[in-house]
Design a protein with these regions (language model features):
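Conserved glycine-rich cofactor-binding loop
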Residues: 14-15
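Substrate-binding pocket helix/loop in short-chain dehydrogenase/reductase
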Residues: 94-101, 105-110, 202
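Active-site helix of classical SDR
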Residues: 124, 160, 168
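Alpha-helical segment proximal to the catalytic Tyr-Lys
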Residues: 129, 173-177, 230
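Short, small/polar-rich loop/turn modules that mediate ligand/substrate recognition or access, typified
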Residues: 135, 176, 181, 232-234, ...
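Residue(s) in the substrate-gating loop at a strand-loop-helix junction
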Residues: 143
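Short C-terminal tail/terminal secondary-structure segment
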Residues: 148, 201, 222, 233-246
Length: 246
């Protein structure tokens, strides 16, 4: 008997970690529904397992609600097996500084929290019934910057990710009654376009003495959504090359 493929909804899919995660799940024969502000690369749109991409700005409440509605219409009555909250934002001030406690207006801070913290919560609520049908898994993408002062992240980004780490534990407790597991992955210095040009100076502070690759994160996300992790919930996995232990 051939089983129907499992389905994952993944945000922030147009580049970097999100793009690699889409490819990873597709190669495992999952159906993938994605969301990002930008259209995905052409090679991704040609993937037969990439069932649908919805352009949406999750920072905007109405756009997020429309995404949930459209994605649920695509699911119909089928279960959802995984939700990967990957979308995130670390903006700069007009003077090209990351948003700190003393610089940047509070409206910019609010926008960071809207995407990095509130969007994962809203999406988890929106897809809760579908995830329950699939005994699903939610994976929130946090950051090493949520656990220690980081020279390039900025206070707004770091505190939003710290809040998401805490939210993951609370969600794990509450979603357990639905049979849904909730975990997070905290990347360290991953070689993507989001990296600061000065990140190379941090390599000596990484015990493995190198940058991570997007696939390092994608494979960890997949593990947390697979049958190999059915007794894991409320956990944050650091994929940092050991940077977080120093």
């Amino acid at each position: 008997m051939v089983r129907d493929p499992k389905t994952v909804i993944l945000t922030g899919a147009s580049r970097g970690i999100g793009h690699s995660t889409v490819s990873f799940f597709s190669k495992k024969n999952w159906e993938v529904i994605t969301c990002s502000r930008e259209k995905p690369p052409e090679e991704c749109r040609r993937d037969p397992n990439w069932s649908h991409h919805i352009t949406a700005d999750l920072e905007d409440g109405k756009s997020l609600d429309n995404f949930v509605t459209e994605a649920k219409e695509l699911l119909a009555e089928k279960p959802l097996h995984a939700l990967d909250n990957n979308a995130g934002w670390s903006p700069k001030s007009p003077t090209q500084e990351r948003l700190g406690c003393l610089n940047g207006d509070l409206e910019a801070w609010r926008r960071v929290f809207e995407l990095n913290f509130f969007a994962p919560l809203k999406l988890a609520r929106g897809f809760a019934a579908s995830l329950r049908k699939g005994n699903g898994s939610i994976v929130n993408i946090t950051s090493i910057a949520g656990h220690a002062i980081h020279p390039f992240a900025g206070s707004a980004y770091s505190t939003s990710k710290a809040a998401l780490s805490s939210l993951t534990r609370e969600m794990a407790n509450e979603f357990a009654d639905l049979g849904v597991r909730v975990n997070s992955v905290a990347p360290g210095e991953i070689e993507t376009a989001m990296l600061s040009p000065d990140t190379e100076v941090l390599i000596p502070r990484i015990p493995l003495n190198r940058l991570g690759q997007p696939n390092d994160i994608a494979s960890t996300i997949y593990f947390l959504c697979s049958e190999d992790s059915t007794y894991i919930t409320g956990t944050e996995i650091f994929v940092t090359g050991g940077q977080h232990i120093l």
